[in-house]
Amino acid sequence: MIRLVKRFAPIAVAGAALVSLALGLSACGSGGESVAGASAITAPPGIQTPANETAAGGRHGGTLTVLNHEEFEHLDPGEAYSSIDYEVIYATQRPLYSHKPNQLGEVMPDMASGPPQISSDRKTVTVHIRPGVHFSPPVNREVTSADVAYAIERGANPNVANPYFSAYFGSLQGASTANGGPFPGITTPNSRTIVFHLTEPKGQIVADALVLPLTAPVPEEFAKPLDEHKPSEYGNYLVATGPYMFKSNAQGKVLGIGYQPGKSAVLVRNPNWNPSTDFRPAYLNQINIQIGGDPEVIGRQVLEGSDMVENEEAAQPIVQLAYEHFRPQLEISPGAGINYIAVDNKQGPFANVDVRKAFWAALDRVALNKARGGELVTNVATHYIYPEIPGFAQAGGLKGPGVDYNDYPTGNMAVAAKYLRLAGYPGGRYTGAKTIQIVGATGSPNSTDAELVNQTLKNLGFKTHFSLVETATMYSKFCGVPAEQIDVCPSVGWVADFGDPQAVLDVPFNGEHIEPSGNPNYGQVDQPQIDAKMASAELLVGMPARAAAWAKIDRELVAQAVAIPFAWDKQPNVESKNVAGVGDEWNLGAWDYSFTSLK
């Protein structure tokens, strides 16, 4: 799914990375790559990665100051869908399952007491709820399965408008007509059990999605009156189940107290949190979040100060400064998504696969990566499943699947000419009459991407009409609207909602997901044979089988050159010298408040 900015513009998420929960939440499968998806991507010496940060043994106490340029999007767990939101959501809420912070290969039962149970026909998923977890004030009672049911049901409430309910929970019985109240697809036979009833054998993807914040319990008696407002006001009056809570008044009001929009937020300890029920150590006593300011000033303050982190992508000059002078305070997180060039597969010159291959062959992907900061923060992409996602190695790993139009990262005009001749242009240059419509995003590095793409197409003989617009406009008015017939969108991207290769490939490249507006399949990719294989792969249970099947689909998508991948992102994050930060590899390496401590 598309998780924009703060999951950082214009990268989409379907947005952030888990593993198959149905395998007992284990990290490895037999006879194949690890569930975490080996990448062979490493950071330079002296730089942290989430994988080499220690989650245990931190010092208890102290106050962490967080400096962020960006504002939160949503504090309601039913609405939250960005990296910066997730860091406070997962510190204050307990979904059914949660990620271990510094690896993609293990997901822990959180509100659940054990792994989900998928029936043999894959149409029923059963989860048992952990006892002894209580809501924060003012609710102050024990969580039951009904609270989890209400949390997910409200995802269908138009006043909440959860962005991924239909994608992952749409196969539940009655989900298509649900509007925020009970529906047949969710039942609670007792206070410790919740059962999901599906119309299709999609139990695996439903089980995977139980790591998302929509599954964090919400007390109906507290939230329902707030959910009747349009939009819901629950995000202004929050109840916590995690180790921390937003500072609030006696009525649970957060707005204006623990959260000052555009200014600050304060997380304090949840007095009702029971550490014996949780895998989080929660070392810190308090987290003070300051919002706004120049990213370069923020980054320098963090590097030169104490007790501070920046919990968003560091600005390029700050990354360079940290690399040269504060290297131990720099974290580089792999698996931060993919950037690619969307081309219109349905109409115009790029409906011809050989024209798409010619464009791919001609493109200087190294130059596009340099615009993003080079090898420290990106790798040249050679296919679609990105590092750390299961199936990455089987899909080709770093080198890629070995096709000539992919073999020259700086571009090869001779190979491009070969494919243009195959497409029916004997001179090896495009001689058609159509003017190519290119719509890119303003601001670095997106505008640089667009300009390089524009020049590459001109070098191939295309006439172009080139426009730059704001990122949100690019998606909402042009690249996400098929009727606009945009031929090329130079810098779109994707971040998976969880570490299943389906979450990388299905939505952006499956013809089933082409929509008249808000279309996430920017290139209108519609290959019936590949769509059928996706439908079969979606039903598989067990990550080794799923990784192998989706890796084959990745190779077929490359063979059809449905889009041109150019960058696998690695996110840079910075901390003060006395902070023992632990990054969430599943969430772009952002600092995890429940595991980070002060030295």
What are these regions, as identified by a protein language model?
Residues 232-238, 266-321, 463:
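Ligand-site clamp/hinge motif
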Residues 114-164, 195, 301, 349-352, ...:
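Aromatic- and charge-enriched surface segment that lines or borders ligand/interaction sites
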Residues 64-120, 238-245:
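N-terminal lobe/hinge region of extracytoplasmic solute-binding protein
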Residues 102, 180-181, 210-281, 286:
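Gly/Pro-rich hinge or "lid" segments in bacterial periplasmic/extracellular proteins
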